[in-house]
Regions:
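Bacterial N-terminal signal peptides
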Residues: 18-34
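N-terminal secretory signal peptides that target proteins for export/translocation
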Residues: 1-17
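Non-catalytic cap/lid and distal C-terminal segments of serine-dependent acyl enzymes
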Residues: 42, 48-75, 80-392
Length: 392
């Protein structure tokens, strides 16, 4: 996988290094200086067994209690042995990638024995991969691979330095004559622009689907989804603040329309025809996809929302003027949510409202909660529908 990267600013580097030192300080506090002075027994964590059970281990002799926090599951208490190592073994897990952390005396920590990370602006976790058959769309296979390009730029709309990622499919030629369709794929609240590649494996999913001729070759643009960066705060406003939420969506839309899309269409071989432009996202990104896409049908023909969250349930105000006439402009409106997701009821209300307006759409309920395990499957099911003569 080719990676084109520009170096981040000094401020970003200092911030990252500071975070590493903070984690080391916390880890030392829990491991204990005495424990560090001794040569510890070699540990392995996580350990994936042949029956898909997973054992997690964490050395913290001074901790009074430790739990395993795993994505989409209840916390599991861990047991300490005489060497001060806490461990727990799960039931067999479905093949997938799972975020997890150790909660030691109330403090969430990554697994120091595992280099695989799930980056997040508020809650970074470790990741365990429970491998499955090659037929799973997020499993890396021996197929032609696309490339990921990482861009940095100064946003005049938002007033900060930010980044975006672009996936180009296998065979993409920047000097060729072929023009490609584009999917603008948005992350969720507290994720950053890398979410769909670092955690969602969007590039792997596209590589596999394109190789199987289940998806059209396309570019995917994954940009930072915060029009109001202050919304990602432990102490300030949040998505629960309706005014800040609206500012976030509007500023994001303006940056997308005036900065991101023009840059993509200048730099890459993509079509400017609305019939070859799609937008989709998860959680906050799903709400942004609906807000941006359904209010700009002159720009987007394909719209997807996975577990969308943060949209006002006053849909008439959020989507003014949207009615059955939109059916003539939309090629696909695809709305999905997990049945155990805390947002299922708000998404069902959206589904009912769309029905009441006679707006044609696909409504998908799947097993699962508000997790990446659901969203990887959403993407794998959504992408094959894009840029077809007949979608819905």
């Amino acid at each position: 996988m080719e990676l084109n990267v520009k170096f981040p600013s000094q401020r970003r580097i200092i911030s990252a290094v500071s975070g590493i030192f903070l984690f080391v300080f916390i880890a030392i506090a829990f491991l204990g200086l005495h424990g560090l002075a001794q040569t510890p027994q070699a540990l392995r964590s996580p350990e994936v067994h042949s029956d898909k059970r997973v054992t997690f281990r964490f050395r913290a002799p001074n901790a009074k209690e430790v739990f395993l926090g795993r994505e989409g599951a209840q916390r599991l208490p861990m047991q300490k042995d005489e060497q001060g190592v806490w461990s727990v073994t799960t039931d067999p897990l479905e093949p997938d990638l799972y975020g997890y952390s150790f909660i030691a005396d109330g403090v969430s920590l990554i697994d120091p024995l595992n280099s695989q990370m799930k980056p997040n602006l508020l809650n970074t976790q470790s990741v365990v991969h429970v491998p499955g058959p090659a037929s799973l769309p997020w499993e890396i296979n021996s197929v032609p691979h696309g490339s990921i390009h990482h861009h940095f730029y100064k946003s005049g709309v938002v007033g900060d330095e930010r980044d975006f990622y672009v996936y180009t499919p296998p065979g993409y030629d920047p000097n060729g004559k072929k023009l490609y369709p584009t999917l603008y794929l948005l992350h969720g609240f507290s994720d950053d622009a890398s979410g769909w590649t670092a955690v969602g494996r969007a590039h792997v999913i596209l590589d596999n689907l394109i190789a199987q001729e289940k998806a059209k070759p396309m570019l995917i643009v994954m940009t930072l989804g915060y029009g109001a960066p202050e919304i990602v705060s432990r102490t300030g406003g949040s998505l629960r603040d309706p005014n800040l939420r609206q500012k976030n969506y509007e500023k994001f839309r303006d940056a997308l329309f005036t900065e991101i899309i023009p840059e993509i269409e200048k730099t890459y071989r993509v079509s400017k025809d609305r019939n070859y432009r799609a937008i989709a996202g998860l959680s906050m990104g799903g709400a942004e996809s609906l807000f941006v896409g359904l209010n700009a049908l002159s720009r987007f023909t394909w719209v997807g929302a996975f577990s969308s969250g943060g949209t006002s349930e006053d849909f008439n105000a959020t989507f003014p003027g949207l009615d059955s006439k939109a059916n003539a402009q939309l090629r696909l409106l695809w709305v999905a949510c997990g049945t155990e997701d805390r947002l299922i009821e708000s998404n069902r209300k959206l589904h009912d409202w769309l029905k009441s307006k006679d707006i044609r759409h696909a409504w998908i309920e799947t097993p699962g909660a508000h997790t990446w395990m659901v969203w990887r499957r959403n993407l794998a099911n959504f992408v094959p529908l894009l840029f077809r003569e007949k979608a819905l």
